[in-house]
From Swiss-Prot:
It is a peripheral membrane protein. NDH-1 shuttles electrons from NADH, via FMN and iron-sulfur (Fe-S) centers, to quinones in the respiratory chain. The immediate electron acceptor for the enzyme in this species is believed to be ubiquinone. Couples the redox reaction to proton translocation (for every two electrons transferred, four hydrogen ions are translocated across the cytoplasmic membrane), and thus conserves the redox energy in a proton gradient. SUPFAM superfamilies: 4Fe-4S ferredoxins (SSF54862). [4Fe-4S] cluster 1 binds at residues 62, 65, 68, 111. Gene3D superfamilies: 3.30.70.3270. GO terms for molecular function: 4 iron, 4 sulfur cluster binding; iron ion binding; NADH:ubiquinone reductase (non-electrogenic) activity; quinone binding. It is found in: Cell inner membrane. One of its GO terms (cellular component) is plasma membrane. The gene is nuoI. This is NADH-quinone oxidoreductase subunit I.
Length: 161
């Protein structure tokens, strides 16, 4: 420790530098958001609650290819399918366990018909474990409720897909 360092520590140079830094930021504009009352803007790529979409004629989009089930790293998706009378295949069961889901978005990327999507909805809860187990009917209801926002987000992000 040299004489210069000794004199600097004697006059508490580090303390003064720290106080100066604190003083500069003390009067700066606050950036804290008071969450329930104020909301920050969300990206169109936000990954929230899952939804199943329908075509404009009301028919569900999912063709039961099971790509989303295969690619899910958390194994949160369960699909069962059945043949229709017209020969096409559709889901008879499509369940997502949100307690397992890591919201990675792989299911959304793997879907060839844009049937399963992640919405901007993040304010949902469950009081029991079973409340976070979404069935096909629940996912279709979420999709029907938020279809306008989903379609707008898909249109905005189309050039990046």
């Amino acid at each position: 420790m040299g004489a210069k360092d000794y004199i600097g520590s004697l006059f508490l140079k580090e303390l003064v530098k720290g106080m100066a830094l604190t003083g500069r930021h003390f009067f700066a504009r606050k950036i804290t958001v008071q969450f329930p009352e104020e909301k920050t803007p969300q990206s169109a790529r936000f990954r929230g609650l899952h939804a199943l979409r329908r075509y404009p004629n009301g028919e569900e989009r999912c063709i039961a290819c099971k790509l989303c089930e295969a690619i899910c790293p958390a194994m949160a998706i369960t699909i069962e399918s059945e043949q229709r009378e017209d020969g096409s295949r559709r889901t008879s069961r499509y369940d997502i366990d949100l307690t397992k889901c890591i919201f990675c978005g792989f299911c959304e990327e793997a879907c060839p018909v844009d049937a399963v999507v992640e919405t901007r909805v993040f304010e949902y809860h469950g009081e029991q474990r079973g409340d976070l187990y979404y069935t096909k009917q629940m996912l279709l209801a979420v999709g029907d409720r938020h279809e306008q926002q989903i379609a707008a987000d898909r249109e905005q992000e189309a050039k990046f897909r």
